[in-house]
Amino acid sequence: MNPLIMSIILATIILGTTIVMTGSHWLMIWIGFEMNMLAIIPMLMKQHNPRSTEAATKYFFTQATASMLLMLAGIINLMYSGQWTGVKLVNPTASIIMTLALAMKLGLAPFHFWVPEVTQGIPLSSGLILLTWQKLASMTGLYMISPGINLNMLMTMSMLSIAIGGWGGLNQTQLRKIMAYSSIAHMGWMTAILIYNPTMTLLNLVIYILMTTTMFMLFMINSSTTTLSLSHTWNKMPLITTTTLVTLLSMGGLPPLMGFLPKWMIIQEMTKNNNIVLPTIMAITALLNLFFYMRLTYATSLTMFPTTNNMKIKWQFENPKYLSLLTPMIMMSTLTLPLAPMMMILN
């Protein structure tokens, strides 16, 4: 893609997200979402093949439907409150419709079907933006309306997302689909704590973005899209293989790595609010995610598929990109668990 066009697209995506995050007027928030959606579609289609076109079309229809519901909720709120400004929704119907719209944009279950399909059909770089940056605006919207959200509806969607995110990733060999299902599960964890402690949701979002970015950068360095191609990392980059192992385990939430911190803090916060059953179910369901990440770890680092002799010396000729950026990213996404006491004080 032309660098000038790419710069304009990225600037529009950033501007759209910024408008949503700083806006208090429902019409401006809707405009920010529309800018964001229309700007990312060319990035999804930059490979010019039928799969990318199909993925971009699915993304467009889903996001357009969610934007329509968002506008409907804003209009209903206008009818009852008499103003566009103010993010507090005074009408329960408007609150429910707005929650459904933002859940559809985030990819929460039962509106999750588009996430694996779209992620599978686009390049890794576009998948990184879709599963990280594109979550910021929608999660900010949920944060804004969190005081008026229907608790039962939100917790139902959260539990479904955590369960489907774990079950859906079990039989996958495509890395992009695994990351998509992992994203659905992580969104479920974040929205589960939204009612009790919205600030903790934002902290967990930062940790999720950090880990997912690190994971996608490792995939892009190896040009890996399947479990089999990831298993060849030993031959190409032995050092990267070791870091991939640790990052995968962190994504699975294994202590004492950074990925364990969000689950620990969420379970602790929900337990303090006398909610025992749901955190127990969430913790058990999280084992599904850990299982498929352990399977990826085994395929990547603990076994080596049959290869030719030429493949075994490829590591001498590799000059990986992103290495200067990747080192601090890996350290932050795996080794920052000792900062947990400070983060808990901030909450």
UniProtKB/Swiss-Prot annotation:
It is a multi-pass membrane protein. The chain crosses the membrane at residues 3-23, 25-45, 59-79, 96-116, 127-147, 148-168, 178-198, 201-221, 247-267, 276-296, 325-345. It comes from the Eukaryota. One of its GO terms (molecular function) is NADH dehydrogenase (ubiquinone) activity. Belongs to the complex I subunit 2 family. Its main location: mitochondrion. Core subunit of respiratory chain NADH dehydrogenase (Complex I) which is composed of 45 different subunits. Interacts with TMEM242. It is found in: Mitochondrion inner membrane. Core subunit of the mitochondrial membrane respiratory chain NADH dehydrogenase (Complex I) which catalyzes electron transfer from NADH through the respiratory chain, using ubiquinone as an electron acceptor. Essential for the catalytic activity and assembly of complex I. Signal peptide: none annotated. This is NADH-ubiquinone oxidoreductase chain 2. One of its GO terms (biological process) is mitochondrial respiratory chain complex I assembly. Pfam families: NADH_dehy_S2_C, Proton_antipo_M. The gene is MT-ND2. Keywords: Electron transport, Membrane, Mitochondrion, Mitochondrion inner membrane, NAD, Respiratory chain, Translocase, Transmembrane, Transmembrane helix, Transport, Ubiquinone. It catalyses: a ubiquinone + NADH + 5 H(+)(in) = a ubiquinol + NAD(+) + 4 H(+)(out). Its EC number is 7.1.1.2. One of its GO terms (cellular component) is mitochondrial inner membrane.
